[in-house]
Amino acid sequence: MRGPPAWPLRLLEPPSPAEPGRLLPVACVWAAASRVPGSLSPFTGLRPARLWGAGPALLWGVGAARRWRSGCRGGGPGASRGVLGLARLLGLWARGPGSCRCGAFAGPGAPRLPRARFPGGPAAAAWAGDEAWRRGPAAPPGDKGRLRPAAAGLPEARKLLGLAYPERRRLAAAVGFLTMSSVISMSAPFFLGKIIDVIYTNPTVDYSDNLTRLCLGLSAVFLCGAAANAIRVYLMQTSGQRIVNRLRTSLFSSILRQEVAFFDKTRTGELINRLSSDTALLGRSVTENLSDGLRAGAQASVGISMMFFVSPNLATFVLSVVPPVSIIAVIYGRYLRKLTKVTQDSLAQATQLAEERIGNVRTVRAFGKEMTEIEKYASKVDHVMQLARKEAFARAGFFGATGLSGNLIVLSVLYKGGLLMGSAHMTVGELSSFLMYAFWVGISIGGLSSFYSELMKGLGAGGRLWELLEREPKLPFNEGVILNEKSFQGALEFKNVHFAYPARPEVPIFQDFSLSIPSGSVTALVGPSGSGKSTVLSLLLRLYDPASGTISLDGHDIRQLNPVWLRSKIGTVSQEPILFSCSIAENIAYGADDPSSVTAEEIQRVAEVANAVAFIRNFPQGFNTVVGEKGVLLSGGQKQRIAIARALLKNPKILLLDEATSALDAENEYLVQEALDRLMDGRTVLVIAHRLSTIKNANMVAVLDQGKITEYGKHEELLSKPNGIYRKLMNKQSFISA
């Protein structure tokens, strides 16, 4: 799948912060002008007119107009007539239809995100598995797998908008309705100005019939604009929800595709924070913010254009202050973007601490460390609060400065407009239209200011997300050779393998490790603790690749095989099986290639073979019993038998087994061992042995010590070596006698 073309997204692309001369930074001026009360300009009565009604607003506006006229010099006779016309305008505006300001301040509510599907189906692969356009370059050879900043490429804003490409038709329709509603809304000041001129220049003419018809016509037009605005909001909100859904699912898919070494170095809490908090923050930038930002941008553009149409001189005078305010806006936006990234990093640390402590609450309770952990978490949250104070201080300074600039600009417009009226370069209707357009532009660019601020915060969080979305896993996910099923035997061989964990490259685990496991045989792997027995199983599953040497399956290097196919042929039962927080039936069905197609009869059959049916039927809900997080509601023996049933349902050719019967009581130990014996029948088995009976029944025993196989043979052969490591382990009673 190729990347999205740029043309449908340019309509949605915000101005770049690197171009201070463009429209966006003007938001600072008019946002503050529309928010900060106390201006003595007459047309600030437009705001109280909406709050208090026409009468008080009209009286207040007339009084302010008179105060303004008394301080105006050189206005001539036009000034007196102008302020009276302005007072009339305030009364008309206060009685105007409320739909004119529909949605000016109150944005749409936060959307609920639909539940994401697990990224395993064809639909997910279409956009998450094969989208080369959203991936960055491959990691360099020296990369250690940590999260790093995304590689330089497309601007992050365009990457963000690239997520909207599948919604291009809905967004294009929304932009069309947005244009319609904006044009209708922004045409009102022009026609109202013409009406004022008619009223002002012909006060004795009976114009009530014409005025009624005109107002009814404008009301119908406003209704059309309101309908278009409602459709625009619906289309933008539903599209935004889909975009966020796609973002979260794509991010989850990218996380699951990473190699295991990545998870060794990246904390789970950090990933959860990115999947929840960062996507929510970025989602607000795309959903709630994008719709209002587009509307505000369209209205601001039309409003500024009409200001130039009404009075180019006055519009040029007003916009001459844009460059210095733009510089302030750019500096503030960049600072806020960096601060947001640092804040999200700190929040991720707090989330990591909480996730780890809550997940291990039994250990915390056993050591009585509740208060200690509370203090640690409070310290992390306090650091987030300190960063929030910095953001609040920056926002206060920014909006305070731009608010002062906005009020000064309003005062300048009144002064300059009065001079133009006095010199007969403007009529009262034109000044009224200009002031109304300025008011609309102030509201619209106020929305753009908020949009810009939220966009910078979203991009700050987005930078963290692109690190994950663009990170290429070092091990292939679903690529490689698939062996012929008919000729597949399951013979395994390690040859001159050297390996160290990527998180600890200075500590070698294997040095010239070699081991051959014939097809259909049972090989017991024994050795002292920490000798690398569990690492052998990890290498066979290709969770890691060796630094040198080869691991082969039926003579094929497993690095050439498809990892998904390879793991589908291998079953595992670990010392401490991990179960999911769902029903017993769902945990058993997890071993199948397609869990949704597994029947209840198949689940019951493998449960019987695993000696699990008896205790399952004792539960009130039977196979529908929920086992709790990591199977915490089950005993060790019960979890072992469910894990064995899960492996039986998978029906693997190769079985990797880490015996864990030493922690079980005699009855559970017998039941688990009997189930394991059934599971091993007819398969190539590599077992980390803890039981003497398993070792005796194994075809071969391999003794692992200091990264090498030091002894290899049958139980009796190894026991006959008086100075051998195996004999020493037996003398220390390292194995269970049963």
Curated annotation (Swiss-Prot):
Keyword Cytoplasm set for record: no
Q: How is its activity regulated?
A: Cholesterol promotes the ATPase activity of ABCB10 in a dose-dependent manner.
Subunit info here reads: Homodimer or homooligomer. Interacts with PAAT; this interaction regulates ABCB10. Interacts with SLC25A37; this interaction stabilizes SLC25A37 and enhances the function of SLC25A37 to import mitochondrial iron during erythroid differentiation. Interacts with FECH; this interaction may allow the formation of an oligomeric complex with SLC25A37. Forms a complex with ABCB7 and FECH, where a dimeric FECH bridges ABCB7 and ABCB10 homodimers; this complex may be required for cellular iron homeostasis, mitochondrial function and heme biosynthesis.
What is this organism's lineage? Answer: Eukaryota, Metazoa, Chordata, Craniata, Vertebrata
Q: Which residues bind biliverdin IXalpha?
A: 402
Protein name, please?
A: ATP-binding cassette sub-family B member 10, mitochondrial
**Which positions in this protein are listed as binding Mg(2+)?**
534, 658
Domain ABC transporter residue range list: 492-731
Organism, scientific name: Homo sapiens (Human)
**What job does the chain carry out?**
ATP-dependent transporter located in the mitochondrial inner membrane that catalyzes the export of biliverdin from the mitochondrial matrix, and plays a crucial role in hemoglobin synthesis and antioxidative stress. Participates in the early step of the heme biosynthetic process during insertion of iron into protoporphyrin IX (PPIX). Involved in the stabilization of the iron transporter mitoferrin-1/SLC25A37. In addition may be involved in mitochondrial unfolded protein response (UPRmt) signaling pathway, although ABCB10 probably does not participate in peptide export from mitochondria.
List residues binding ATP. Answer: 530, 532-535
- GO cellular component annotations of the record: mitochondrial inner membrane; mitochondrial membrane; mitochondrion
